[in-house]
Amino acid sequence: MDTILWILQGALAVVFLGSGIAKSTMSRERMIATGQTGIALFPMPVVRVTAASELLAAGGLLLPWATGIAPWLTPTAAAGLCVVMVGAAWSHSKLHEPQNVAANGLFFAAALAVAIGRLAML
């Protein structure tokens, strides 16, 4: 189980590191052009706060558990990503993008598995 959780944590960290960097550095138009269409419904300050949340979560998925320093932050980061994915799914649903809603559901499920799995190991 530990190996599966590490794989999920690593995959989620890579995805959300990339997404967070994109949301923190790109213009609205460029994000939409590169596939980050869900941001269209939100003002840029919300997008930038989401970017910061994704970047912090990417680190929180790996570093606390790997170092043993405040390991409770790992399931907390995963739970935070679940909240982000609910917002993303809502946004893509409003934009009638079922494939993106499904992808958000997959990321939600992976983050939930990490949150529950790591919480059980505390």
Annotate each PLM feature.
Residues 1-122:
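Membrane-interface extramembranous regions
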